[in-house]
Regions:
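Acidic, metal-coordinating catalytic segment for phosphate/diphosphate chemistry
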Residues: 1-22
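Nudix hydrolase/Nudix homology domain
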Residues: 41-43, 107-154
């Protein structure tokens, strides 16, 4: 396997994936930070594409701050989620707020602290599960979806 990984590969033979990061920011009262995306109006976790020069933890802290104005301490990886339609692998981390003030950005039209029930009401299943997985303490979870529905493992 190591020999295979060290050999140059044809561009068409190796599938390319985008790596994104997202933060499940949990306040002491149990409310969860969410944004309404500016591009499509859906409610999701704050997050985005991991930059080449940053660690996943630094990336999630940057994305949460950029989209919400909230600084966070990153606790732990709670899930890995693959969008099989778009080729995106999302690393999701549970975080604690450590400062800042809620604000919108060019990527968000609303920032809100939701209860777990509100998460299920406002978010599509494939995004709500990321928050609910982070709360159950049994992670990290590994799941796949097609952008709309979870895909059963196996």
């Amino acid at each position: 396997m190591l020999l295979y990984m060290s050999q140059p590969q044809e561009a068409t033979s190796t599938p390319l994936h985008s790596v994104s990061v997202a933060g499940v920011v949990v306040r002491e009262d149990g409310r969860l930070l969410a944004i309404r995306r500016a591009d499509n109006g859906t409610w999701e976790l704050p997050g985005g594409v991991l930059e080449l020069n940053e660690t996943p933890e630094a990336g999630v802290a940057r994305e949460v701050w950029e989209e919400t104005g909230i600084h966070v301490e990153v606790d732990e990886l709670t899930g890995v989620y693959k969008n099989t339609t778009r080729g995106i692998v999302a690393l999701v981390f549970r975080c604690k707020p450590s400062g800042g003030t809620e604000r919108t950005s060019s990527e968000s039209t609303a920032v809100s602290w939701l209860t777990p029930d509100e998460v299920s009401d406002r978010m599509a299943e494939v995004y709500a599960i990321r928050l609910l997985d982070a709360l159950d303490g049994a992670g990290p979870h590994v799941r796949s979806h097609d952008g709309k529905h979870l895909i059963s493992a196996g």
